[in-house]
Structure formats: structure tokens, C-alpha cells
Amino acid sequence: MRHSLPASIVHALLLAAALAVGTPAHAQTDALPSWNDGPAKQAIVAFVKDTTEQGSAKFVPPEERIATFDQDGTLWVEKPMYSQVMYCFDRVGALAEKKPELKNVEPFKTVLSGNREAIAKLGMRDLEKILAATLTGMSVDEFQAQVTKWLESAKAPRYDRPYTELTYQPMQEVLSYLRANGYKTYIVTGGGQDFVRVYSERVYGIPPEQVVGSAGGTKYGYDKSGKPFLTKEPKLLLNDDHAGKPEGIHLMIGRRPHAAFGNSAGDQQMLEYTKAGDGARLAMLVLHDDATREYAYGPAQGLPDSKVGTFPQALYDEAKKQGWTVISMKDDWKRIFAWE
């Protein structure tokens, strides 16, 4: 026995099906559920809609859809110290086991002491010595294995969680949202390119070839069996910070981004470079103003000053002047981490 549905229900089902078919990814569901509905979220949604809808005056061809993201402080926690620096400090202990004489040599002696106040007072030359000793002198494969092993056990002191669990859920949603709408996402970081490439695909869905960072030289050679390998050398090829970011983008990507995201003075030139292009451009800065859920630092807007991820008032003023969007962690993000 056949039963017919009421005409009103049939009409509703047909309408729903018609709306679902061919609907752009940005219009089907809320792709940014961890964002409060405010100017920042609206700016992202409007940008994606304007640049991906056929017939839009601001339409961007798929091959030109490039979005760049700083990592530390933009995609994951950078306090109390950059994760790569924490890795280097931890590696000093392993080095001292192989070379006991380092226990009496500065700055390694200070790091091994565990005295946080003394470590915080180390100068740039001291840090350079530590970075050179822990990031170079081994093969690329050995370095990748060391970083992978460290990430398996290292935890951020405040949260007692692995660093890879301290990515910002709202920014993860932006990455996915952009990719769903044809954007290619890149990490452009002042941190070590080889370091970030170890985990970028697993943590952010960004393959290693789409990571641009501060890069050191390598030397080609052969092991005892004749197998070729690369050795990391203490020679800086690219300082991917401040003006180095647009230089790195040109060198490694070859296209000017249509969207750029950062959080500090080191990202200013990347945002300037992005906005200077023709057509629709999106420039956004994350402001850390939530001491309860994460950290609060600036010193923009009267927030505490910080040597890590400095966001000066001059950058805040420039953002307002240039029409960049400042993302307030406190006001714009419903939650910060996926595990909240």
C-alpha cells in the first residue's frame, strides 16, 4: 500500500535538497563554532565568501588562494617561552652526558642548573651558543628523530599537557575553513623551519613543504655505507622574522598571500606585504588578553609587557589605521583549546 506525503512536507524536502546541492562550503554550517559572533568572525566569513563565490567582484582564482600563518602565539601557545627554545634547553642535558666538560662551561652551566631566574637573564649570544649546539652538527634525519621523541614526552608547565595539544581551536577552525574553500595554508614562522616541519602536518594539516621558517644551511655527505645524507650546519640562510617574512614568502612560496595571520611585531611586515596586494586581502592579529584561560601580554592596550610575542601599542595603532582586524582572545573566542 502506497502512502503519499503531504504536499507541504514534499515541498520542504525539495527546498532543503535544492539548498544543499551546490552550496559553497562556507554557507552550509557554522565552520567557526569556537568563535563568538563579532567583527573578527564576520571579517573571516565575509572574506571567504567574497573571494570564493563565482561572480563576486572580489573573486580570487583557486591557484592564487594563499593564506599564511605565524605559529608561536598565533596557532599555539608561546608562553612562558617558545617551544623550540624549551627543546634546546632540554637537549643541553643530553649534550652534557656526551660532553661532561659542558657542565662547567657557560651558558650550558646555567641551563643545567635549572635556575629559572638565571636562565631568563641569558643574553642573545648565550642563546646563540645554545641553539648552535642543539640544532646543528647532526644529520637532518637524526634531528627529526630527536624532535619527535621530545614532543612525545615534553609538556608545557602551566597546563601539564604536550605542546601539540596547546594549539588554538579557533585557529584550527580557520585553517580547515580556508582549505575547505580552496585556500592553501602555509606556516610562516620566525622559528626553525626544520623544527616545525617535524609536526606541522600531524598537528595543523600543513605539509612540511608548506612551512617557511628560519632556515640554516646543510652539507651533503655520505655515511660509511655510501648512503647520502644532509648535516645541519650553524649557518643562517633565512631569518624568517620581521622583514624576513615577506622575503621568505617570495623565496619559498612565490605568491603574495591574500590572507595573513600573526600576533606580534615580528609579523607586521608580513601583514603589510599581504595588504599591499590588489583585490581582497585579510590581515589579522591575535591579541593575548585572557590571563584566565591563557596569558595576557602586550604591552598594547595596557597589557603587561613581554619579551616573548611582543605586541606593542604602535602595532595596535597601525592595525587600526590600516584596517587590520585585531582578534581578542577574551572576547572573540568561546574556547581556546579543543580539550576545554
Residue ranges of model-derived segments:
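Bacterial N-terminal signal peptides that target proteins for export
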Residues: 1-13
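Non-catalytic pre-domain segments flanking phosphatase-related domains
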Residues: 3, 19, 26-71, 86, ...
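Bacterial N-terminal signal peptides
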Residues: 10-22
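A metal-dependent, Asp-based hydrolase signature
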Residues: 28, 81, 86-165, 169
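C-terminal cap/substrate-recognition subdomain and adjoining C-terminal extension
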Residues: 28-35, 39-45, 49, 64, ...
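Short, solvent-exposed loop/turn elements at domain surfaces
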Residues: 53-55, 76-78, 220-221
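Asp-based phosphoryl-transfer active-site loop
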Residues: 65-80, 271
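Short catalytic/ligand-binding loop motif for oxyanion handling, primarily in non-cytosolic enzymes
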Residues: 77, 84-85, 195-196
